[in-house]
């Protein structure tokens, strides 16, 4: 399968740089997987598309202000993007500098350059850094870090992004990108869903910067997926099994919830799904047989990205590319701060041949 098969033309003007004034005020493009039928609407239409007893699975990760600016003590500006917090004082990070720091190098970080860190070791593309500070990593980042807006949002981060680029139910700090499908849910909508009898469960997947990395191979099967930490606790497993037993749908909110649930399914030695705690490199592309997820709430993704491949595996390649073509024609807003889709799984998708 060629990566180029997942390309589409996207006018720059359709990339959303700011969210809608009201979280649930975005548009919703619904795609019926089995038939390919498209329906245009608004996000709150989701209330009518879900039935009592359906299970919504959210990702409760919280985005950390993971971007730091500074310089090497020896001179030379640099930018640090924390990828993973290892403990109270150590992180793995991407470091952008004219010359990469060597082990033992001292970094001066923050707008006042008053945060000191030491480069301990290099692990492939990531640098292990130790903050030489009494405060823990999260306290330091909250004090001097910048929100790591995606590269396609071409503006500096603003104070408002600390909450806007965050789901209202976020609880577990550790992500460097938001699980953006969840940004559309506000407190009133969550309350209405509960009143309607929609069940809810929460997984954790700390989204890494790798989610924005382009696929650098020509053939999909050659791509090596980045690693992210995920947790699917026993209560989520129980909720999924109970939902299936009552004949209702498991609805994943976002591709990170999909990847968490399907990782837990792959880990199950007996039965449909088992608790999962650890790193996942699951790469879902056409031909994949979904085990758990019946429907999906997701935003519009980048051309040739692993996420549009995941959606194509779920809805079918032709259905997905047609939906994206229609979304562009109807001027939907794309990417993290953009509009949403609601997709039901196409059971014939794994057998479909990918051909533009």
Swiss-Prot record:
> Its Enzyme Commission number?
2.4.99.17
Reactions this protein catalyses = 7-aminomethyl-7-carbaguanosine(34) in tRNA + S-adenosyl-L-methionine = epoxyqueuosine(34) in tRNA + adenine + L-methionine + 2 H(+)
Instruction: Report the GO terms under cellular component.
Output: cytoplasm
Q: Give the GO terms filed under biological process for this record.
A: queuosine biosynthetic process; tRNA wobble guanine modification
Named in its record, the pathway it takes part in is: tRNA modification; tRNA-queuosine biosynthesis
Keywords of the record, alphabetical order, are:
Cytoplasm, Queuosine biosynthesis, S-adenosyl-L-methionine, Transferase
Gene Ontology MF term list: S-adenosylmethionine:tRNA ribosyltransferase-isomerase activity
Q: Write down the InterPro entries for this protein, in alphabetical order.
A: QueA, QueA_dom1, QueA_dom2, QueA_sf
Superkingdom to which the source organism belongs: Bacteria
Determine if Glycosyltransferase is one of this entry's keywords.
Answer: no
Gene3D superfamilies in the cross-refs: QueA-like
Q: What's the top EC group for this one?
A: transferase
**Keyword rRNA processing applies:** no
The record's subcellular locations are: Cytoplasm
Which Pfam families does the UniProt entry name for this protein?
Queuosine_synth
- Stated family: Belongs to the QueA family.
Q: What does this protein do?
A: Transfers and isomerizes the ribose moiety from AdoMet to the 7-aminomethyl group of 7-deazaguanine (preQ1-tRNA) to give epoxyqueuosine (oQ-tRNA).
Q: How does it assemble?
A: Monomer.
Q: What is this protein called?
A: S-adenosylmethionine:tRNA ribosyltransferase-isomerase
